[in-house]
Swiss-Prot record:
Protein's GO biological process: lipid A biosynthetic process
Biological or metabolic pathway of the protein: Glycolipid biosynthesis; lipid IV(A) biosynthesis; lipid IV(A) from (3R)-3-hydroxytetradecanoyl-[acyl-carrier-protein] and UDP-N-acetyl-alpha-D-glucosamine: step 1/6
Name of protein: Acyl-[acyl-carrier-protein]--UDP-N-acetylglucosamine O-acyltransferase
Organism: Anaeromyxobacter dehalogenans (strain 2CP-C)
Reactions catalysed according to its record: a (3R)-hydroxyacyl-[ACP] + UDP-N-acetyl-alpha-D-glucosamine = a UDP-3-O-[(3R)-3-hydroxyacyl]-N-acetyl-alpha-D-glucosamine + holo-[ACP]
Main location: cytoplasm
Keywords: Acyltransferase, Cytoplasm, Lipid A biosynthesis, Lipid biosynthesis, Lipid metabolism, Repeat, Transferase
Domain of life assignment: Bacteria
This protein's record includes keyword Chaperone: no
Enzyme class: transferase
Subunit structure: Homotrimer.
Length: 257
């Protein structure tokens, strides 16, 4: 382990010997860090934060800070981060709150660009790409392989489905269905993330079924309940469309249409 002489690793922190801690970095007493993590100059990892392996935290990032929530009263909450994530300069990720389950979670293989923010109680899947200055409010669910363009934002409690793409400077105020693209100041539906599906290795048949589902929900005159019923009748039994159907049925805020 390489700990710079100016870094502070507080008593109680459990840091794997293979980690690198840069100049003036601060590691709090409740932090648990697995092998191969690196923490850059002036970065802070604090709170009850657990990191897996091979995460990179760049200078001035703050990982595990207390929630930006007026209801937070200092309760013991946590942040759990997987493996191989990158948190660029000034990125912030907050702990959970008692009112939101107590744990903020981030999967593996994500890129959180400079000045991006992940709020309290968010659940972020694998392979997220969160671009510069993106603001994700509390309690947001982001499924696997979601992309947020720069300067975009999500309202609290929204859900963004697998392989969705949120364009730059977009405000998300309702759920974004899996495989879909939204863009514009008010987060309007802009089609399917076909390139993302192809890059994820989905077959032509799978992409074709998603296109059928998209047309039923978003390009017909059916109400959402009627569209879901038609999806279940015509496209159930395939993982990609089963997930699409389950996501629609689980929406509390409504679907971006």
């Amino acid at each position: 382990m390489a700990i710079h002489p100016t870094a502070i690793v507080e008593a109680g922190a459990q840091v794997d010997p293979s980690c690198d801690i840069g100049p003036y970095a601060v590691i709090g007493p409740l932090v648990r860090m697995g092998p191969g993590n690196s923490v850059g100059a002036h970065a802070v990892v604090t709170g009850r934060t657990t990191l897996g392996a091979s995460n990179r935290i760049f200078p001035h990032a703050v990982i595990g800070g207390i929630p930006q929530d007026l209801k937070y009263r200092g309760e013991d909450t946590a942040l759990v981060i997987g493996d191989r994530n990158t948190f660029r300069e000034f990125a912030t990720v907050n702990l959970g709150t008692a009112g939101g389950g107590g744990v903020t979670r981030i999967g593996s293989g994500g890129l959180f660009m400079a000045s991006s923010h992940i709020g309290h109680d968010c659940q972020v899947g694998d392979g997220a790409i969160i671009a510069n200055s993106v603001a994700i409010a509390g309690h947001v669910l982001i499924e696997d392989h979601v992309h947020f363009g720069g300067l975009s934002a999500s309202h609290q409690f929204c859900r963004v489905g697998r392989l969705a793409f949120v364009g730059g400077m977009t405000g998300v105020a309702m759920d974004v269905a899996p495989y879909c693209t939204v863009a514009g100041a008010r987060g309007e539906l802009a089609g399917l993330n076909t390139i993302g599906m192809q890059r994820a290795g989905m077959t032509e048949e799978q992409v074709g079924r998603v296109k059928q589902a998209y047309k039923i929900v978003f390009r017909s005159s059916l109400g959402l309940a009627e569209a879901i019923a038609q999806l279940e009748a015509e496209l159930a039994g395939h993982p990609e469309t089963d997930h699409f159907i389950a996501f629609l049925k689980g929406s509390q805020r409504g679907i971006t249409r």
